[in-house]
Amino acid sequence: MQEDKLKVTFEKALGVPVKWTNFATGGEMTEAMLSGDIDISYSQGLTPFVNAVNAKAPIKLVDVAVLYGMGGTTCVVSNASGITKANASQLEGQKVAVPLGTMADYVFRETMKAVGADDSKMTVVDMVPEDGSVALVNGDVAMACLFGGKSIEKALESGSRMLSVDEAKAAGIAGIDITSVTDKFMKENPGMVQTFVEVTHEANARHNAGKSDLNIIAKDAEMDLAATKGQIGGFEFPNASTIKSKYMNKGGILMNYLDVMGNMFATSENPALKDYSAVVTTEFLPM
């Protein structure tokens, strides 16, 4: 997808200029959509999407962007703290950095359940991943939950993963990023939405066939080639058929995740939806 962004494939297919904007979190993506600054959010975490629709935001989920294990989203605990999964309850009473309302927030909650630590007894400091990793290295927090290769790499300079990628997988902790679109843009430009999704899936097919240019992707991500290969190696880009039959279908993996997360992050002001299928559509997925 990043390769096609740099090669202006999207502009050529859509027939209009495309303004690409990077955001630190999926919550910032939502805010930009609601303010009218952007029309489509690619690789928005499922957690910020759920928070948005619980708050009645006029957006829809139109595609699965990427599936990932906890290589790209994880909790890193300070080596100096002496805390590991074996004595994780010692985090209680300590400061931890978490970008609230993101997939890292979901991973934080699920990881604490898996290691038997009470997250309600920790002082949670809301920090974007870049700041959280610096806080961990500086000794300001005992643990930082993060996403993004650069932030995790920085945190690992002075910390270790609370759970390995395999341990997180065994605990049922996994991530899904999605593509969401504002209701207004979807209604006014359905053809553009369809083209955007189609070009994305063409890029995914090329990646799955081993034909992506990782040098271009590494440059765009501001990472070295080895780190890029390592991070992308933990990503999965399902095709449209798989998404329709296993993820966005009734009882599918994505729909179950929406229900679980919707209730996990529900508040009295923004309760969980009774039916999340109302904010999901498969109409733009390739045949």
What are these regions (language model features)?
Residues 1-117, 123-126, 142, 146-149, ...:
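Short, glycine-/small- and polar/acidic-enriched structural segments
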Residues 6, 25, 29, 48, ...:
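Stable alpha-helical elements in mature extracytoplasmic
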Residues 258-287:
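Conserved C-terminal helix/tail region of periplasmic/extracytoplasmic solute-binding proteins
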Residues 4-16, 93, 167-171, 240-255:
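Short, solvent-exposed loop/beta-turn-alpha elements that line the ligand-binding surface or hinge
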Residues 13, 32, 36, 51, ...:
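Structured segments of extracytoplasmic/periplasmic soluble domains
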Residues 125, 130-220:
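Pocket-lining segment of extracytoplasmic ligand-binding domains
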